[in-house]
Amino acid sequence: MAVIGTITVTSAGTAVQNPVSGNCRGIMWRARADNTGAVYVGYSNVSSTNGVHISPGDAFTALFNGYERLESWYADAATNSDKVDFIADNS
């Protein structure tokens, strides 16, 4: 079963926790094409210097050996109000 959601980074430079909880085997992140700048995904300390850089319209997929908690992932952005969508496999 898939879990689908969106994270909106209201304030650039401030990490936003994934609002969905539960286990997953993988997550695909896609930055919205109409974003002004890049988004960054990672753990609670995610930033432009240590997160996975995703340009507007691009995607990044993380696959795990076993399960990872969805709420352990965060997003940050270079620009206020940019969004990143995600789909996670929790089967």
Where are these regions (language model features)?
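Ser/Thr- (and often Asn-) enriched beta-sheet segments in non-cytosolic proteins
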Residues: 3-8, 40, 53, 74, ...
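Short, solvent-exposed S/T- and G/P-enriched segments that are highly enriched in secreted/extracellular
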Residues: 7-17, 49-66
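Exposed low-complexity, polar/acidic, P/S/T/G-rich flexible segments that act as propeptides
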Residues: 81-91
